[in-house]
């Protein structure tokens, strides 16, 4: 799959890769090489399979025949310039694009070999299984406790013991419990931006999803809060498949196992983060990660 994918929807002009240029743009290639396993998509269990996916806004085609495999319990990063289709593709995975007037898709997205766009799919259940965290923290105007318990109550879970245990577990999973355990009845709106984002992650994992979609989850946060989110992503991938959209290539290099580079609605290149950042197959990829455009 990896070799086939890398050569689909690509510009085939290749040039020798100049590693020193990456260091000049702040990406420590040696650190990536030291930290990454020798990954291959061929050896992975696949969580999400994208087959010939096209997306249209009215008559405008925004995604052009995407083929992609998202490995289970790994972090996959989508990178590329603004408007390239990263977030559009991400929102396809839990059908958030259904909410956009005039939006339609051709092709398939398979979750556990089931097409999530087939007729009769329970979209609410799909969005439980494939949770999403947005760029700007969006806590509800409720207490910290009720923010996390909200999805459970929607599912009809109201037993206090179950709610208490799940809220504590979810807040611990989001590395927030120690900071809020003595003020669970305080408003979530009083938390810092970084705490609010981790609360949103806790709210998402409380309903036991299989996949977490993160759309620029740290772009509105300060460096310390960003570091906490990145550390949390490393922890969460032990239990969840994670797909993250980021404009920050250093962040993609730090947190992801696999990276997909997109440009103008096309998937240009996909591979292990190690391979893509140290030895990209396509000149377009090299140009982007070395800062020539984007």
Curated annotation (Swiss-Prot):
Location(s) in or outside the cell: Cell inner membrane
SUPFAM superfamilies: P-loop containing nucleoside triphosphate hydrolases
The UniProt record lists the keyword Zinc-finger: no
A GO molecular-function annotation: ATP hydrolysis activity
Location (main, coarse): membrane
Catalytic activity as recorded in UniProt: phosphate(out) + ATP + H2O = ADP + 2 phosphate(in) + H(+)
Region Disordered, annotated ranges: 1-24
Gene Ontology biological process terms from the UniProt entry: phosphate ion transmembrane transport
Record-annotated ABC transporter domain positions: 48-289
Family listed: Belongs to the ABC transporter superfamily. Phosphate importer (TC 3.A.1.7) family.
NCBIfam families xrefs: 3a0107s01c2
Record function comment: Part of the ABC transporter complex PstSACB involved in phosphate import. Responsible for energy coupling to the transport system.
Protein name as catalogued: Phosphate import ATP-binding protein PstB
Species per Swiss-Prot/TrEMBL record: Hahella chejuensis (strain KCTC 2396)
């Amino acid at each position: 799959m990896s070799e086939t994918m890398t050569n689909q929807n690509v510009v085939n002009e290749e040039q020798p890769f100049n590693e020193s240029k990456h260091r000049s743009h702040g990406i420590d290639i040696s650190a990536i090489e030291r930290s990454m396993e020798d990954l291959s998509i061929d050896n992975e269990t696949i969580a999400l399979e994208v087959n010939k996916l096209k997306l249209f806004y009215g008559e405008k085609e925004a995604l052009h025949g995407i083929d992609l495999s998202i490995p289970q319990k790994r972090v996959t990063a989508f990178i590329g310039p603004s408007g390239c289709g990263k977030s559009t593709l991400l929102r396809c995975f839990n059908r958030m694009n259904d909410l956009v007037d005039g939006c339609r898709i051709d092709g398939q997205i398979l979750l556990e070999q089931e097409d999530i766009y087939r007729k009769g799919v329970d979209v609410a259940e799909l969005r439980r299984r494939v949770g999403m965290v947005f760029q700007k923290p969006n806590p509800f105007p409720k207490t910290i406790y009720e923010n996390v318990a909200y999805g459970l109550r929607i599912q009809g879970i109201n037993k206090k013991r179950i709610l208490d245990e799940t809220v504590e577990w979810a807040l611990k999973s989001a590395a927030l419990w120690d900071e809020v355990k003595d003020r669970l009845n305080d408003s979530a709106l009083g938390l810092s931006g970084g705490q609010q984002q981790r609360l949103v992650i806790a709210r998402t994992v409380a309903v036991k999803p299989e996949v977490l979609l993160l759309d620029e989850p740290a772009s509105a946060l300060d460096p310390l809060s960003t570091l906490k989110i990145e550390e949390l992503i490393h922890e969460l991938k032990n239990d969840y498949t994670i797909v993250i959209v980021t404009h920050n290539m250093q962040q993609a290099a730090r947190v992801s196992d696999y990276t997909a580079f997109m440009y103008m609605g096309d998937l240009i290149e996909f591979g292990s983060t190690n391979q893509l950042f140290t030895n990209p197959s396509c000149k377009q990829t090299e140009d982007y990660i070395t800062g020539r455009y984007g």
